[in-house]
């Protein structure tokens, strides 16, 4: 975990946002972290005290832990972009690390919000979330991710959402590992270590709303266009062929 948190510790070549006009590429991991951070601001500045308490009570955790969990869940919304989505645009796809581009055999096209829902389910279970039934907290968190474009999706626990089917559809071992590492890094950086034993429907709806707002705010074109062209890792020579950062030249 500490290694992944270092500048050169994790592959940041997969893209999250792309401006065709400016050819500006914004790394997916940065977008996930942006949305998590903005979700914390939405919690502090937009939600009422009653809404914050409703979410905390709906998860059975204190307010401070609830804030961390809301940030974590909001940040996970685009985890499903670590999949065939990456090939949608040729320019940013060409920047994806060689190792990842070589590990795509068998992956299938899937809306990224559904891919987020499906891929997160197993990761949530591995993290200790109950995913046994449709009303379990792990399943509801996964559905929050699937609904970040405004429509709640059905999650078929015994069908399309089974880990064996998901792993076949969303890329090879390197993509699976990177999804796991992004998940773990987000959880670590947001402090969302507590595992809620429940997640009520009203809390789920409010958390979905926080995530939608945070995503919209963090995805404003004028911000992404500027930031997508400026980080050190996107300067000439700042990314190695493995997609990991190295100091900029010059």
Please give the residue ranges for each predicted region.
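Accessory nucleic-acid engagement/destabilization modules that flank
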Residues: 1-250
């Amino acid at each position: 975990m500490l290694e992944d948190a270092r500048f050169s510790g994790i592959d940041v070549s997969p893209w999250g946002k792309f401006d065709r006009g400016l050819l500006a590429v914004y790394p997916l991991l940065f977008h996930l972290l942006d949305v998590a951070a903005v979700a914390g601001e939405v919690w502090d500045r937009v939600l009422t005290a009653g809404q914050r308490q409703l979410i905390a009570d709906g998860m059975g955790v204190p307010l401070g832990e609830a804030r961390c969990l809301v940030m974590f869940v909001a940040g996970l919304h685009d985890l499903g972009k670590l999949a065939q989505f990456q090939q949608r645009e040729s320019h940013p796809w060409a920047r994806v690390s060689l190792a990842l581009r070589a590990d795509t055999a068998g992956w299938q096209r899937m809306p990224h919000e559904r891919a987020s829902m499906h891929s997160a389910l197993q990761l949530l279970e591995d993290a200790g979330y109950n995913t046994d039934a449709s009303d379990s907290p792990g399943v509801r968190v996964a559905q929050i991710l699937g609904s970040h474009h405004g429509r709640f999706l059905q999650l078929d626990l015994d069908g399309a959402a089974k880990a064996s089917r998901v792993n076949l559809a969303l890329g090879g071992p390197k993509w699976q590992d990177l999804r796991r590492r992004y998940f773990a890094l987000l959880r670590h950086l947001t402090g969302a270590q507590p595992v809620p034993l429940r997640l009520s429907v009203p809390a789920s709806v409010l958390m979905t709303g926080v995530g939608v707002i945070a995503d919209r705010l963090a995805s404003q074109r004028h911000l992404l266009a500027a930031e997508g062209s400026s980080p050190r890792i996107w300067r000439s020579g700042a990314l190695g062929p493995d997609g990991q950062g190295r100091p900029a030249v010059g």
